[in-house]
Each structure stands twice: as structure tokens, then as C-alpha cells.
Regions:
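Proline-threonine-serine-rich low-complexity tracts
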Residues: 2-83
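A secondary-structure boundary/capping signal
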Residues: 47, 92-93, 247
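Ser/Thr-centric signal marking residues that sit
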Residues: 56, 63, 97, 210, ...
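Alpha-helical cap/lid subdomain in secreted, periplasmic
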Residues: 116, 121-136, 149-288
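Functional beta-strand-loop-alpha-helix junction segments that form "active/interaction loops"
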Residues: 139-147
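Structural signal for short hydrophobic segments within the conserved structured cores
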Residues: 11-13, 138-140, 243-245
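Residue-level signal for beta-strand positions within conserved beta-sheet cores that form or flank
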Residues: 3, 39, 85, 133-136, ...
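Serine-esterase "nucleophile elbow" of acetyl-processing enzymes
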Residues: 80-140, 156-162
């Protein structure tokens, strides 16, 4: 008579779920050894079953023709998809939020290819990670807008979009059209401060972006003005309890790749880098752990 059957279960299995319900898990039935005659192997839950989020112990039993059995078990862990505390995100700003760029050698040939603005790419990144939620990113960019004049439009957009999160990125135009450089800096700082305060008052989590660097040789805003504005944006973020997204620090190391030939607007790669940076900031601040 043959020895009693033996069975060895597979190693623990971990699967990421596409939704909070669970996930179907397929696995190979353990192979039995020894035993009399044909040995059957049955596992519960069976391969292909839907396992709930969490840890499930799977029991496997081998039975030979003499009804002798051997058993083993292994764990199946279903990891719930990540979730975000916010699902409605309003990107508010100027032409860099619109996504204007230059694809030719003409520094005045501005275009905004569909799906390439940072809010559009941000939406793609968020949707790919938070598969169990519907994340909406509203692009509320306006070409040529000055931050200190933006409040009426901001309020209208906020009432319409009802965002949980507001991302602010503007201030270039305030400096460029200011009566003096000092007034331009002051207007940018005033505008972002008021917008951040209003967004917080209305219950949104606020993210403030520093201004991107200019391209060497074509910089339209002097380095001192950028440094001054960005330093005050950092202060505003602290004072208003906002999250600072330091785009200047991220884009400066490879400015020729990220900034268009006009020295102000970003390249398609630059907008993707902005989206990745804002995505990382939102994930760090708002992902449920």
C-alpha cells in the first residue's frame, strides 16, 4: 500500500484590487505526492474566485482513493486601491494653466494642443492611480490673466466647479504689466494671497505653485523678481495653511527642456513635469493611508 498523500501549498499571494469590492485570483492547484491511486486536490476558495479586500486563508485538501487526506493552507491578500480625500480639483491660473506652448521656431506661434496642459495630464495621472474613484480636474486657465484682478472669475469658477482642491499658478502677467517692477511683484503677491484665502474660506484645500524659471537669454521676468515673488508665495503658503508646490525648484535644473523659446511658457515636457509635481503633492497630502 502506498504512503499517505502529501501536499505543499503555494507561497502567499498578494493582489492589488481594481475596486474596493475585491479581486478575482487565479492560482495553480497544489501538486500532491504519494497517496493511493488518483489523488484529488480541492482548494477553498477555488482558483478564479473573487477574494474580498483583506487577508483570506485558502485551505487545500488532497484525498487519495483510500480516503486518506493531507492539507495545507496559504494566504491571499487583496490590497484595496488607493483613495483620495478629494475628487474635484480646480486648476486656476493663466496661460500656463491653459497649456500654451510653442511647437515651431517662431517665438510668437502659440498653441495649446488638446490633452497636453498640466491639468489634463494631472487628470490622467489621478485617474490611473485612483481607479475606484471618479476624479475630475477642471482647467480654469485664462490667457493673460493677472492674479490681482482674478477674484470675480475665481468666485464664479468655484461656485460652478465646487472643488475640494484648488491649485493656484499665476503671477507672471501681474509683473509684466505692472506700472513699475515693484508694483508688478506686489500685485502678484496680493492676488495669490487673496485667492488662497478665499479658497480656504470656501473649504478647499489650497496648493500654491511657485513661478517657473525663465529660459536663459530670453527671460521676461528678472531673476530678482522671480526670487522675490516665489519667496512671498512660500510665506503665503505658510500663513494660509496651503501646500507649496515648488515648480521653480523642479524645472530649474533642465530649464531648456522645460521652457519654450519665448522664455516664459512651458514645453509639452515642461507641462508634463508640472503635472507630475502637482500629482505628487496631492498624493502626499490627500491620499488615504
Amino acid at each position: 500500500m502506498a504512503d499517505a498523500p502529501e501536499i505543499t501549498c503555494p507561497d502567499p499571494i498578494t493582489v492589488s484590487a481594481g475596486s474596493g469590492v475585491g479581486a478575482a485570483v487565479s492560482y495553480a492547484l497544489p501538486e500532491s505526492r504519494k497517496g493511493q491511486g488518483a489523488v484529488s486536490v480541492v482548494c477553498t476558495p477555488s482558483p478564479g474566485s473573487t477574494f474580498p479586500v483583506g487577508v483570506t486563508q485558502t485551505q487545500c485538501v488532497a484525498t487519495d482513493t483510500l480516503s486518506r487526506t493531507a492539507s495545507c493552507s496559504f494566504s491571499v491578500t487583496i490590497v484595496a486601491p488607493p483613495r483620495l480625500r478629494a475628487t474635484r480639483i480646480m486648476a486656476f491660473g493663466d496661460s500656463l494653466t491653459v497649456g500654451q506652448t510653442i511647437l515651431s521656431n517662431d517665438p510668437y506661434d502659440f498653441v495649446a494642443p488638446p490633452g497636453t496642459s498640466y491639468p489634463a495630464v494631472l487628470g490622467q495621472l489621478l485617474s490611473a492611480r485612483y481607479t475606484d474613484q471618479t476624479i475630475t480636474v477642471f482647467n480654469r486657465g485664462l490667457i493673460g490673466e493677472q492674479a490681482w484682478r482674478a477674484m470675480p472669475r475665481f468666485i464664479d469658477a468655484f461656485v460652478t466647479d465646487r472643488p475640494d482642491v484648488v491649485v493656484l499658478q499665476e503671477g507672471y502677467n501681474d509683473y509684466r504689466v505692472g506700472e513699475t517692477p515693484a508694483i508688478g511683484v506686489a500685485n502678484a503677491v496680493l492676488g495669490i494671497s487673496e485667492l488662497a484665502r478665499e479658497a480656504r474660506r470656501r473649504g478647499a484645500r489650497v496648493f500654491i505653485c511657485t513661478l517657473a524659471p525663465g529660459r536663459p537669454g530670453r527671460v521676461q521676468i528678472p531673476a530678482w523678481a522671480l526670487e522675490d515673488i516665489n519667496a512671498q508665495y512660500r510665506r503665503i503658503a505658510r500663513d494660509e495653511g496651503a501646500v507649496l508646490v515648488d515648480l521653480y525648484a523642479v524645472l530649474a535644473p533642465d530649464v531648456n527642456a522645460y521652457v519654450s523659446i519665448d522664455g516664459l511658457h512651458l514645453t509639452l515636457l515642461g507641462y508634463r513635469r508640472v503635472a507630475e509635481t502637482v500629482f505628487a503633492a496631492i498624493r502626499a497630502e490627500l491620499e488615504i493611508r
